[in-house]
Amino acid sequence: MTNTAPGIGNYRYRILALVFMATTINYFDRSIVGVMAPTLQKLFDWSNKDYAAVMVSFKIAYGAGLLFMGGIIDRFGTKLGYTLSIVTWSIFGMLHAAIRPAFSLAGFIAARFGLGIGESGNFPAAVKTVAEWFPKKDRAFATGIFDASTSVGAILAPFIVGAIVTIDGKNWQIPFLLTGLLSSLWVYLWLNTYQKPAVHPKLSKAELAYINSDSEEETDEKIPWLKLLPKKETWAFSLTTVTDGVWWFYLFWGAKFLGEQFDVDIKNIGLPFLIIFVMADAGSLIGGYASGALIKRGWSINKARKITMLVCAIIILPVTIVPVIASKWIAVILIGFGAAGHQSWSINGYTLVPDVFPKKAVASVIGIGKMIGVAVAIIADIALGTVLDRANNSGYFWAFVIAGSSYLVILGFVHLLMPKMTPLDDKLEYIRK
């Protein structure tokens, strides 16, 4: 477990709490359309291909935004970069409520595009915050804590949306407006709380020393992302993010699958999502703690991260049989194991970046990697929407087969690209110990 002894202090966890809050808002905002998908399709007469176009719009913007939002955060700092991100996504989130039925498809495509640009800054900023405020041995656990908030947002969405929105779609605008209020509160707290550890007046010398105990000093110079592309370590991380499409499949298509397969509607989607995403939260926390605990027991960072990710990949495998399961609750539990394994995999994947790259490159590398993952998810959305319109539910069969089997294959390639996880210095040269 992380060091929180009174002599050291734990102010860093206040900063982490704000990252947790921001990511919860991020995923609540992101999840609203997925929860309302069956209702919105009926209300606006969308086909599966139309719904896929709305999802693709978000992901195109999200992937493109990751390139420059990561660079903005690296160049201008976490405090201002994170603020810009959440203000942008809040504005476009609330704009969903202004869309009129006659322009529903075009309106949602435009609003989701703006939302994707803003939300693309959250994870690069969050991981950079953890890299600034936590030593390497605690980063996986800290990342697990804030990554668990993705499930909190996904859990809150069906209950809040289900309580506000009727089955026929009345009051569908209100959840989008609610996110703006929550985001305004976060911006106020963030601007009045965050500073870098070295200059924070409320941080004790002992805690600052602990934060810097196994961390390199950060310089003001930033590494352009074009210099990062040739590094095989960048591509190793990018491969781990390809599985983000699986998580988004659960998030954006999960309610549709449960509705079409088991007649689950907007009023009773809450409990299945609660089970799935509570399991995901548990996976996030356990996965983050496990690799950190192994490192503290003397395991190398390389071995601890990869063994943890291997266990995750094995846990995820049974999700391949979900489409042929007759029981709703067994299907929900298997999806829950898939989500839990993914979250554990994801937080260990994120920590590969600060484990290997210097701090000044962290947000940019994550942005590049996430963009690659988003590109794959876009292709998957287009294919799934097309297949569902033409062949009913057979598209779900292949979606779950890929969702369950891809992690083992990807981990093999990650190991080939980065067998020893040798860290890089500020010049992107290997540090030989």
Stretches found by the model and what they are:
Residues S31, K59-L67, A154-I155, F249, ...:
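Residue-level signature of mid-helix packing/kink "hotspots" within the transmembrane helices
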Residues V87-A102, L310-A326:
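C-terminal ends and interior cores of transmembrane alpha-helices
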Residues S284, P354-R390:
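A late C-terminal transmembrane helix in Major Facilitator Superfamily
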Residues V33-G34, P230-G287, H342-S346, Y350, ...:
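Extracytoplasmic gate region of multi-pass secondary transporters
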Residues A111-S151:
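Cytoplasmic helix-loop-helix junction between adjacent transmembrane helices
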Residues A140-G162, A280-S284, K370-A380:
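Glycine-rich segments within core transmembrane alpha-helices of 12-TM secondary carriers
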Residues F146-A198:
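Helix-loop-helix hairpin linking two adjacent transmembrane segments in secondary transporters
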Residues A64-L105:
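Conserved MFS/SLC helix-loop-helix module at the cytosolic interface between two early adjacent transmembrane helices
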